[in-house]
């Protein structure tokens, strides 16, 4: 956190960088709603962890599918710590820039955001776990199998 944001602790970065960026210019009612959610989480009356675990399960399954078909995970560590599975993860394919990969995957019905649009210097894509449904994993595997067959030298 110190290298990336100039702050040393999670709390400092979270309050002064993340929360400020998310809530500055936001209406009072939205800020109060967010504060209420944080309060219930802190009080233990809202188990937010169980609410977000599904994204981790999806990411774990999606990462396996992508890596089984020749992709690699771009960001798998933050400094020396492994990155947990969650809402987003990053992928790359050998010999392709993020833009090339994004364009090519569209032909296979797979969409993601190029890492270059997020300010990253790494080549690859940012994939989101939020919209995939259980019945779509097999379809994704079929599409990535075709992708690999068509992109293997």
Language model features: what each stretch is:
Residues 48-63, 73-92, 118:
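Conserved glycine-rich beta-strand-loop-beta hairpin in the small C-terminal domain of fold type I
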Residues 26, 47, 54-58, 97, ...:
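Soluble or luminal CAZymes and related metallo-dependent hydrolases
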Residues 1-53:
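Conserved core segment of the aminotransferase class I/II
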Residues 65-69:
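A structural motif corresponding to the C-terminal end of an alpha-helix
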Residues 28, 103-112, 116-153:
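PLP-dependent enzyme catalytic core of the Aspartate aminotransferase-like
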Residues 91-95, 129-131:
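Short beta-strand-to-loop capping motifs
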Residues 35-38, 63, 90, 102, ...:
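Non-transmembrane alpha-helical segments in soluble domains
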């Amino acid at each position: 956190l110190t290298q990336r944001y100039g702050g040393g602790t999670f709390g400092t970065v979270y309050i002064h960088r993340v929360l400020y960026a998310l809530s500055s210019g936001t209406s009072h009612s939205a800020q109060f709603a967010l504060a209420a959610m944080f309060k219930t989480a802190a009080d233990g009356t809202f188990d937010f962890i169980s609410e977000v675990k599904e994204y981790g399960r999806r990411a774990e399954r999606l990462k396996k599918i992508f890596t089984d078909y020749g992709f690699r995970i771009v960001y798998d560590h933050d400094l020396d710590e492994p990155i947990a599975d969650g809402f987003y993860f990053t992928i790359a394919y050998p010999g392709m820039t993020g833009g090339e990969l994004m364009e090519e995957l569209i032909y296979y019905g797979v969409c993601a955001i190029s890492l270059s649009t997020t300010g990253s210097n790494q080549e690859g894509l940012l994939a989101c776990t939020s919209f995939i449904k259980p019945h779509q994993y097999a379809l994704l595997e079929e599409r990535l199998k075709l992708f690999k067959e068509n992109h293997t030298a």
